[in-house]
């Protein structure tokens, strides 16, 4: 079975976008968790 990945990041300026593209290109499912700046 494939591992279950979770991407944790702060919203802002698309910094996690490259990681999302890499997961998609690899066909890897992942959980996307965004945190807001307070």
From Swiss-Prot:
Signal peptide: none annotated. Residues 3-38 form the GST N-terminal domain. Keywords: Eye lens protein. It comes from the Eukaryota. GO terms for molecular function: structural constituent of eye lens. S-crystallins are structural components of squids and octopi eye lens. Contains relatively little if any GST activity. This is S-crystallin 3.
